[in-house]
């Protein structure tokens, strides 16, 4: 075999192994980012509609409606 081809193959193999070996640490960082994203979503949870509208929707049982789930999230207990 050509010597240059062998050298290129070995360097490629070494690079592949080093990149693959460093990935588990990256996955942990990505998981932490997802947890932070979930926390931010919980903090951003709010009622968009006026409080009286949300209270009325809850009292008549409309919280199962997608409209009220999204716009009265705190009152309807979506978050």
Swiss-Prot record:
GO terms for cellular component: extracellular region; nematocyst. This is U-actitoxin-Oulsp1. GO terms for molecular function: potassium channel regulator activity; toxin activity. Belongs to the sea anemone type 1 potassium channel toxin family. Type 1b subfamily. Residues 45-79 form the ShKT domain. Residues 67-68 are annotated as: Crucial for binding to potassium channels. It comes from the Eukaryota. It is found in: Secreted. Residues 1-21 form the signal peptide. Disulfide bonds join 45-79, 54-72, 63-76. Keywords: Cleavage on pair of basic residues, Disulfide bond, Ion channel impairing toxin, Neurotoxin, Potassium channel impairing toxin, Secreted, Signal, Toxin, Voltage-gated potassium channel impairing toxin. The 49-Phe-Pro-50 bond exists only in the trans-isomerization. Negative results: has no effect on rKv1.1/KCNA1, hKv1.3/KCNA3, rKv1.4/KCNA4, rKv1.5/KCNA5, hKv2.1/KCNB1, rKv3.1/KCNC1, rKv4.2/KCND2, hKv10.1/EAG1/KCNH1, Kv11.1/HERG/KCNH2, and Shaker IR (tested at 10 uM). The keyword Cytoplasm does not apply. Residues 22-43 form a propeptide. Toxin that weakly blocks the two voltage-gated potassium channels on Kv1.2/KCNA2 (IC(50)=1.8-2.5 uM) and Kv1.6/KCNA6 (IC(50)=5.6-6.2 uM). The keyword Signal applies. Two similar peptides (OspTx2a-p1 and -p2) are obtained after synthesis and oxidative folding. They may differ by a D-Cys at position 76 (corresponding to OspTx2a-p2). Since C-terminal Cys residues are prone to racemization during solid-phase peptide synthesis, and if the presence of a D-amino acid is correct, it is probable that OspTx2a-p1 (L-Cys-76 form) corresponds to the native peptide.
